C-alpha cells in the first residue's frame, strides 16, 4: 500500500 509506505518514509 503506497500510503503506508509514504508514512514510513
From Swiss-Prot:
One of its GO terms (biological process) is defense response to fungus. Keywords: Amidation, Antibiotic, Antimicrobial, Fungicide, Secreted. It is found in: Secreted. GO terms for cellular component: extracellular region. The modification Leucine amide is found at residue 9. The keyword Secreted applies. Found in the hypopharyngeal glands of the worker honeybee. Has antibacterial activity against the Gram-positive bacteria S.aureus ATCC 6535 and S.saprophyticus, and the Gram-negative bacteria E.coli CCT1371, E.cloacae ATCC 23355, K.pneumoniae ATCC 13883 and P.aeruginosa ATCC 27853, and antifungal activity against C.albicans. Lacks cytolytic activity and do not induce rat peritoneal mast cell degranulation. This is Jellein-3. It comes from Apis mellifera.
